[in-house]
Amino acid sequence: MGWARQPGLRTVQGVLEDALGKVLREPIQLTVAGRTDAGVHAEGQVAHFDTAAEFDGPQLVHRLARFLPKDVRVKRADVVPPDFDARFSAIRRHYVYRLTTAPYGAEPLAARSVVPCKSAVDVDAMRRASGLLLGLHDFAAFCRRREGATTVRELQRFDWERQGDLLLAHVSADAFCWSMVRSLVGAVLAVGEGRRSPEWVAGLLRETQRSSSVTVAPAHGLSLVAVDYPADDELAARNVQTREMRSAPAVEGCCGE
């Protein structure tokens, strides 16, 4: 299920707001750091809500566990400064994409979060291609266009880690536009499988619109693992800076960004 509440559909936002409403006995509206599409996971999602109610964080976490479904958990709850905004205060979002090169595919217990790929991928070539994408660029070729939204982003980390048969892509940026992370992974995986060159990936940065040659990697391999925030006394300034950078109601996150 995806994040955003939708009439008649089961979503993460919907089940969380309903559970919070039952515990706090008031309507709750969440603002989230990264809205994820259906199939994308989140291990380090951050959301905030406004309330006049007083509560103990650990006790709220314990009580929510009684109302939430097994596939949604709240791991921590804190009272934050008034200037904190889960979306606009964020300075960096971290994602991991999980692939397996095992000849038999993903382990059964990991099948919902690991995507099979070819066994003989050239990880060194993938690392070279990923390095060419780092920095402040227009990632239009990797993003699904949203009217009025910028596709300029600062890609701060994009590297690959081997753990046996597991191949992990670590991707971090100030923010991501819609489908960007999965498109980055799909493009670089094409290099690893010998279908494209690192230079082809770098050339995509010259495109001004979504490239039909870029394959979007499957949703279930992707997970939001962490969100970074500034010190409390820098929150207000960060909110203003982020709002000025976003010229339209673009959605921040990984795949529904």
Curated annotation (Swiss-Prot):
One of its GO terms (molecular function) is tRNA pseudouridine(38-40) synthase activity. The active site is at D37. It is an enzyme of class 5 (isomerase). The keyword Disulfide bond does not apply. InterPro entries: PsdUridine_synth_cat_dom_sf (IPR020103), PsdUridine_synth_TruA (IPR001406), PsdUridine_synth_TruA_a/b_dom (IPR020097), PsdUridine_synth_TruA_C (IPR020095), TruA/RsuA/RluB/E/F_N (IPR020094). Keywords: Isomerase, tRNA processing. Pfam families: PseudoU_synth_1. SUPFAM superfamilies: Pseudouridine synthase. Belongs to the tRNA pseudouridine synthase TruA family. This is tRNA pseudouridine synthase A.
